[in-house]
């Protein structure tokens, strides 16, 4: 190899390395910065955009509560019963304290007012929200439901509480009885736990399953395996023909005070969420 050929080869190699370095620099600078929203599992993440320097994967994959429907049912005078059905799509996450608010609007879509309350929701639960006898100075045409930020709690191997309703019935009251109509039934606690409070929501539907009226009551201090009668009374005449009665029983398993102290032995595993 002549001296001139060697010189040409060296110049060619230098030119190649300069172009390669420039190309690598352009490629590096054109790459998006690593983030927790780039859709790529990088920067020591445990999953895509979660774990490591990003939020925990279980929090990233938690879904919002779904609002299935809402309705304002006219009650006595200027009062309404506000009703919604919601669903928690998360199989192992729930919350013992969920802050929510109903906003109600008139026929011209003007906000009339709002009503706030607290509830709880269990993993994978579909439930009703009821606010009874809420005052409104104008007729309610539209009802909206929203939630504040929820502090989720995880339950491993969750099984829903076995609370059953039997012998439910609805009847009109006689003139000798106080009120217009009444729903009743038997609540059975088939869990292994003694609960301090169990909520019962009652919905009356017509033959088209349109909501006519709602009511609510509660059962206190129901032991494991025990059953208890419940009654709810409507004092105002209900417009429409009642064809179906839906009754939902639920209890807050996230509240330690809701579990009555066992007489013997250690607390059940169900409380260890």
What kind of region is each of these model predictions?
Residues 1-8:
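N-terminal Lys/Arg-rich, disordered targeting/topogenic segments
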Residues 8-60:
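Cysteine-rich modules of extracellular adhesion/ECM and protease-associated proteins
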Residues 29-30, 55-64, 154-163:
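Proline/serine/threonine-rich low-complexity linkers at boundaries of modular beta-sandwich domains
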Residues 60-116, 130, 194-196, 203:
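The feature marks the first
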Residues 65-72, 86, 113-117, 130, ...:
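Short structured motifs
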Residues 78-93, 150-214:
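Surface-exposed interaction/gating patches
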Residues 110-138, 212-238:
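Intrinsically disordered, low-complexity Pro/Gly/Ser/Thr-rich segments with frequent PxxP/GP/PP motifs
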Residues 134-174, 231-273:
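Terminal connector regions
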């Amino acid at each position: 190899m002549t001296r001139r050929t060697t010189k040409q080869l060296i110049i060619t190699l230098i030119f190649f390395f300069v172009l390669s370095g420039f190309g690598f620099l352009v490629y590096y600078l054109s790459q998006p910065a690593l983030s927790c929203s780039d859709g790529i599992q990088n920067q020591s993440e445990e999953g895509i955009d979660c774990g490591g320097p990003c939020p925990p994967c279980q929090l990233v994959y938690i879904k919002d509560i779904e609002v299935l429907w809402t309705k304002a049912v006219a009650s006595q005078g200027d009062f309404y019963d506000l009703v919604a059905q919601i669903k928690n799509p998360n199989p192992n996450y729930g919350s013992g304290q969920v802050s929510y608010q109903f906003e109600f609007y008139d026929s011209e879509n003007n906000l009339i007012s709002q009503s706030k309350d607290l509830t709880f929701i269990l993993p994978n639960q579909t439930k009703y929200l009821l606010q009874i006898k809420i005052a409104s100075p104008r007729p309610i045409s539209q009802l909206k439901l929203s939630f504040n930020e929820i502090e989720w709690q995880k339950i491993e191997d969750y099984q829903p509480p076995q609370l059953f309703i039997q012998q439910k019935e609805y009847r009109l009251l006689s003139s000798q009885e106080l009120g217009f109509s009444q729903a009743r039934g038997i609540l059975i606690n088939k869990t292994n736990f003694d609960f301090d409070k169990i909520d019962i929501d009652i919905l009356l539907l017509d033959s088209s399953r349109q909501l006519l009226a709602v009511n609510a009551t509660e059962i206190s201090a129901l032991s494991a395996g025990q059953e208890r009668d419940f009654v709810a009374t409507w004092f105002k005449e209900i417009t429409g023909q009642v064809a179906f009665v839906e009754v939902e029983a639920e209890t807050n398993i996230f509240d330690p005070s809701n579990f009555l102290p066992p007489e013997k032995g250690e607390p059940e595993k169900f409380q260890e969420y």
